[in-house]
Amino acid sequence: MYKLKKKVIYFLEGTGLLLIFIFLRILPLNTSSFLMGKLSSLIGPKLGVTKKAYNNIKNVMPEKNEKETLKIIKNMWENLGRVIGEYPHLKKLVPGKNNKIQICGIKNLLLVKKTKTPAIFFSAHFANWEILPMVSIKNGVPVLTIFRKPNNPIINFLIKYLRSDLPMAPKGREGAKKIIYSLRNGISIGLVIDQKMNDGIEVPFFNKPAMTSNALALLCHKIKSLVIPVEVERIKNTNFKVTFHNPVKVSKNGKKKTSLQIMTEVNLIIEKWIRKNPGQWLWLHRRW
């Protein structure tokens, strides 16, 4: 009975999302993004899950007053809605098309080709985090993106279809071999690493202990690779800026840094991005 109920729920959820995406795909990119952003900013702040975002902001940014906190929450929901509205139009966000994406630090991206060394690109749930692999591939740097496989098989199929042009590997054991194989064969990978990982290590984040995945550090210990931070910012509406920052130094005096040292530096970089544009980060994670 439980399995049947779960299948029915999955079917209703998946079919509902599919119909929404079909409708959004009919609309122009700008309209789809605006519509979902507006709806999300009106409905999202009233949902119970918003309490988690509110508590997170108060926990790590106590200097923000009530008005500023509520503005961050509203902006967060608008950005999340826009991401949903942009999902059916991902291929229209390819760099060079409609001049939607401004790229900075291109020399750091091209280091992969220059040094013939694969990169571990890391980013966060910022602006539209789906843009990174398209920017990289467009500039001749193949990248394998790591994703969390949805429990709902219909939603999983839909997401894989929308990302059909992008090489992907699921998180966990299933994708681990593919990730290592890719790096060893010169193919870069893309990680979104701002979520809590109970099987990770405790690393400071906003000066507070946070369980953090150390997969990035373990990979660069195992396989020679560049570790490149990629910051994605929503400049206005569906216009973005993607910045490839200087590689993180994973060695000191010829000796590899520890996982804790590397991940502390990574968390500091992400924290800097969040403080710069707090309304563009997804505060809904149970990060601390």
What function would you assign to each model-found segment?
Residues L19, T31, A53-N56, I154, ...:
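Hydrophobic alpha-helical segments typical of transmembrane helices
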Residues V49-K52, R148, N152-P153, A210-S213:
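Active-site metal-coordination segments of metallo-dependent hydrolases
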Residues L109-L110, P133-M134, N156-K160, I179-I180, ...:
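Short amphipathic alpha-helical segments and helix-helix/interface helices
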Residues M1-S123, Y161:
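Membrane-anchoring hydrophobic helices of lipid-metabolizing enzymes
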Residues P95-I101, R148, D165-K171, F205-N207, ...:
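Short, flexible loop segments at the rims of nucleotide/cofactor-binding pockets, characterized by
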Residues T115-R173, N198-I201, R234:
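Catalytic core of membrane glycerolipid acyltransferases/transacylases, capturing the structured
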Residues K6, K71-K74, K113-K114, K138-N139, ...:
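Non-catalytic C-terminal accessory region of glycerolipid acyltransferases
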Residues T15, V49, I101, K171, ...:
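Soluble or luminal CAZymes and related metallo-dependent hydrolases
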